[in-house]
Swiss-Prot record:
The chain crosses the membrane at residues 12-32, 99-119, 127-147, 163-183, 198-218, 266-286, 296-316, 317-337. The gene is ctaA. It comes from Methylobacterium radiotolerans (strain ATCC 27329 / DSM 1819 / JCM 2831 / NBRC 15690 / NCIMB 10815 / 0-1). It comes from the Bacteria. GO terms for molecular function: metal ion binding; oxidoreductase activity, acting on NAD(P)H, heme protein as acceptor. This is Heme A synthase.
Length: 367
């Protein structure tokens, strides 16, 4: 019996599910960015993974939550005199961010259990999904550790390093989802030459590094200084005594606004140069499909650079900063899909190449 049609439908369902989860992760990053930019991230002072899904429902509940917030350094230093109505707005952003995280968990694990039972998950895919599930759980813990850092005495915001780690982990989950989804395609796709495959893989790695550096810029508010381009304080390269003004020197990479912003700028140039060289190489030596995808990466990188420059020159308005963060996810998605497809696909259907996990795997693959 020819099972190719059934295999295509099964693979398509899994691929669609993975892309839906990836889209939810992008939404999560967007809501998280809005939560940070509106100063809402410290409005919920407790981590209750289950009961926290229920927001305050009565005036007494709201008064209790507001009383907890009034004990935080952020309130006492920045927001003294804030009324309950303003607090509800802050609380709504943070609660929505956490609720979306719970929704992502359900949308990820419930279909995963169903697909596993139906035998639609191959062993290789299953291991990848298991790793992403564990990383998602770790991400929740990282989020609370980040929030807790902002509740310490004298703090009015979360620690920049923890914010960057939280953003990068979300980005890594997104990259993993689209990598696995792209790998679920059926048919035949010739692999690109080895050099192109290597540089295609380098691109999402560089983008992840750049996202981490962007998290440091956001967390330290380094985008609010040196609001000129291409120079910083009138120079293309600030003097070393400005870049390494803090002792010990290693702390400059997190706490020195000049070095934090300079690192983000230089890495952006590096990503652009690598993307352009890769696209030229793909045009000259690679298959047409790889050349088209590589050109798409360049276009997105160029758009992201332009938006980043505009965000800097405008002194980080909320809309520009949020768009810059979301477009970074688009760049990462395109670069990751391109890297995965550059590896090509063989003639053998994955479902036939290895036994599936789940009920059908135990039954020998008979349906």
């Amino acid at each position: 019996m020819d099972m190719s049609g059934a295999g295509d439908r099964r693979s398509g369902a899994v691929r669609t599910w993975l892309y839906v989860v990836a889209a939810l992760v992008v939404a999560m990053v967007a809501v998280g960015g809005a939560t940070r930019l509106t100063g809402s991230g410290l409005s919920i002072t407790e981590w209750r993974p289950v009961t926290g899904a229920i927001p305050p429902l009565t005036e007494a509940d709201w008064a209790a939550e507001f009383a907890k917030y009034r004990d935080t350094p952020q309130y006492n230093i920045l927001n003294q005199g804030m009324g309950l109505s303003a607090f509800k707005v802050l609380y709504g952003w943070e609660w929505g961010h956490r609720l979306l995280g719970r929704v992502i968990g359900l949308v990820f694990f419930l279909p995963l259990i169903l697909f596993w039972w139906q035998g639609r998950i191959s062993r290789r895919l299953g291991l990848g999904l298991l790793g992403l599930g564990l990383l998602g759980g770790l991400q929740g813990a990282i989020g609370w550790i980040m929030v807790a850092s902002g509740l310490q005495p004298g703090m009015t915001a979360v620690a920049p390093l923890k914010l960057a780690l939280h953003l990068t982990t979300a980005s890594l989950i997104l990259a993993g989802l689209v990598w696995l989804a792209a790998g679920e395609r059926r048919g035949v796709l010739a692999p690109a030459p080895a050099r192109l495959r290597a540089t295609a893989l380098l691109l999402p790695i560089l983008v992840l590094v750049q996202i981490f550096l962007g998290g440091l810029v956001a967390g330290s508010h380094a985008g609010l200084v040196y609001n000129t381009w291409p120079t910083m304080d009138g120079q293309l390269v600030p003097p070393l005594d400005s870049l390494f003004a803090i002792r010990p020197w290693i702390e400059n990479f997190v706490d020195n606004h000049a070095l934090v912003q300079f690192d983000h700028r230089v890495t952006a140039y590096l990503v652009f140069v690598v993307a352009v060289l890769h696209a030229v190489d793909a045009r000259l030596t690679g298959p047409k499909s790889a050349a088209g995808r590589a050109a798409g990466v360049v276009i997105l990188v160029l758009a992201q650079m332009a938006l980043g420059i505009a965000t800097l020159l405008l002194a980080v308005p909320l809309w520009a900063a949020l768009a810059h963060q979301v477009l970074a996810m688009a760049v990462l998605t395109m670069a990751t899909v391109h890297a995965r497809l550059s590896r090509g696909f063989g003639l053998v259907e994955p479902a036939a190449a290895e036994p599936p996990l789940g009920f059908e795997g135990l039954a020998g693959g008979r349906i």
